[in-house]
Structures are given as C-alpha cells and as structure tokens.
UniProtKB/Swiss-Prot annotation:
Name this protein carries in UniProt: Large ribosomal subunit protein bL36B
Key words, A-Z: Ribonucleoprotein, Ribosomal protein
Species annotation: Neisseria meningitidis serogroup C (strain 053442)
Family: Belongs to the bacterial ribosomal protein bL36 family.
Domain of life: Bacteria
Cystine bridges: none
NCBIfam families: PRK00831.1, rpmJ_bact
Length: 41
C-alpha cells in the first residue's frame, strides 16, 4: 500500500479504483488489482 499526499492520480490508475473513508483516513481500494491500494496521510 502506498502512502500518498494526494489521491488524485491514485483513483485514476484503474477503472475499478474507488475512494473510501475509514477512521478519518482516505483510502483507495481496488478489488480487481490490489496493488493499486493507497492511503492518504
């Protein structure tokens, strides 16, 4: 999982990527290609 300051490019990497808020942090999850997971600082 990458830790990024901006998730703008992370959500555009794959069409299945979606943004989720969990416990005050913003995550990008991708079910079909899990290597595109990311978290915002």
């Amino acid at each position: 999982m990458q830790v990024l300051s901006s998730l703008k490019t992370a959500k555009q990497r794959h069409r299945d990527c979606q943004i989720v808020r969990r416990k005050g942090k913003v995550y990008v999850i991708c079910k079909s290609n899990p290597r595109f997971k990311a978290r915002q600082r």
